[in-house]
């Protein structure tokens, strides 16, 4: 129960953080008014949770003070980039398939929900993935469409490095709004005037925007964050149909490799048996 409670706390905390990214970018002085489709937060960059009670700016800073930006000041800046719909689905798959043994890849999103089955084949665990607007309405993801994504510098680099770590199996390439690959993510930091918009500042400003419901002069975390809103749902079904339906390209490739390996082994066994029989 303690582990479940802690996991739920983390989900709610990271939902607040990912929503803060969206709020900050859409409300910063340098915003061009373009809607943010998805915000991505990795659990690995968050150093502390937010417990019930007063949350100070110092606590927010301490929870997200890792790294620096181009300006050399403490804290990773927010990054504005674009991913294709296909890459967004891959982001969900990275979390579902890799995060259990590579915790920095555990991701939380605002604007994108997904369902995954931990018993399915690796890189084919996600069974449903879709966007959700501010009204909560479901929007299907179009594979070739560019979507506006906001994350922090650390996450942007981590997602970009997935290609190397997966030996080319997985590809997530942050792009500009015209679809050109971004070479230096630091050049795409979200600016607030002449300053980089730091992730911790975005979180603090978002919390300060909450309504003061008890009229004590301090903003209150909304009731909305008392639940996870099924942003990430685990379907633990072991039904054989649910385990094999809708195979993606990774599943097909893995099955193909297994068939080839088994075929080679059978040929070797057949060859060895043939040689032994000849010697007799």
Protein language model regions, located:
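Active-site-adjacent helix-turn-beta-strand microarchitecture at beta-sheet edges
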Residues: 1
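Catalytic centers of hydrolytic enzymes
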Residues: 5-9, 13-280
């Amino acid at each position: 129960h303690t582990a479940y409670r802690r996991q739920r706390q983390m989900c709610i905390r990271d939902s607040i953080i990912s929503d803060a990214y969206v709020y900050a970018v859409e409300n910063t002085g340098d915003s061009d008014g373009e809607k943010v489709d998805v915000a991505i937060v990795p659990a690995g960059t968050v150093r502390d949770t937010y417990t019930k009670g007063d949350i100070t700016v110092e606590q927010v800073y301490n929870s997200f003070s890792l790294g620096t930006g181009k300006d050399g000041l403490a804290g990773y800046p927010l990054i504005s980039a674009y991913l294709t719909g296909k890459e967004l689905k891959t982001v969900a798959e990275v979390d579902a398939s890799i995060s259990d043994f590579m915790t920095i890849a555990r991701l939380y999103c605002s604007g994108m929900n997904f369902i995954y089955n931990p018993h399915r084949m690796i890189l084919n665990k996600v069974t449903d993935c879709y966007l959700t607007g501010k009204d909560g309405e479901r929007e299907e993801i179009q594979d070739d469409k560019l979507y506006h994504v906001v994350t922090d510098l650390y996450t942007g680099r981590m997602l970009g490095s997935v290609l190397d770590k997966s030996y080319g199996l997985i590809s997530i390439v942050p792009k500009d709004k015209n679809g050109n690959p971004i070479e230096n993510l630091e050049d795409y930091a979200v600016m607030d005037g002449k300053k980089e918009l730091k992730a911790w500042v975005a979180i603090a400003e978002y919390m300060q925007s909450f309504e003061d419901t008890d009229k004590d002069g301090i903003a209150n975390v909304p009731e909305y964050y008392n639940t996870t809103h099924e942003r990430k749902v685990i379907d633990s079904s072991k039904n054989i149909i649910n385990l094999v339906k809708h195979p993606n390209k990774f599943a097909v490739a893995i099955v193909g490799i297994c068939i080839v390996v088994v075929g080679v082994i059978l040929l070797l066994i057949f060859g060895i048996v043939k040689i032994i029989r000849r010697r007799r």
